[in-house]
Amino acid sequence: MTARRISSLVALLVATGFASPVSAQHGMDHSMHRMGPEIVIPKGALYTKADVEFMQMMIAHHAQAIVMAKLAESNSTNAQLLKLSRKIDQSQMPEIQIMQDWLRRYNQFAPDTASWHDVRMEGMLTDQELAEMNKARGVQFDRLFLVGMIKHHAGAIKMVDDLFKSPGAGQEVDTNVFANDVVAAQTAEIGIMKRLLAQLPKQ
């Protein structure tokens, strides 16, 4: 990975607000289990620690998907892929706001979009994979994007599955609705991406 490739990717992230030199100040512990202060659940709360962790980590997960979607604007000319990438961009940013609002409502730490760079959740791409995607153009980019985003979406679905397996989690009304919406939307998009991938020229 060259310095030029790294700098161009960082420039994109800073320009779109998905990287910040002060992101480390938010108390990220670089684990898959917690970001920010220790989670304290009030007695009698309708939500669980797993609900809070799910919302916090899904913010980071969504934020990386948006970074990937924005790369398509400059790196792809595939009309169907661009339509999908714009849908991902336009739908997941409002969902991040929903999750942040949910966390603030319950006085829990709400990470910003730069948090994706500090954690690695199910299906998230590595810095190397993002750098390769940033470098690629045309069909090469399309294939990397589709394979990467299918993996990314599958990771989000696994996160929801893990949420509902946690005792008492996913029962708070807004959490339940949101989590099920994530599964429905991303399952449908995986189907679209698999079809697009099958239509690409053979290597």
For every predicted segment, state its role:
Residues 9-17:
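Bacterial N-terminal signal peptides
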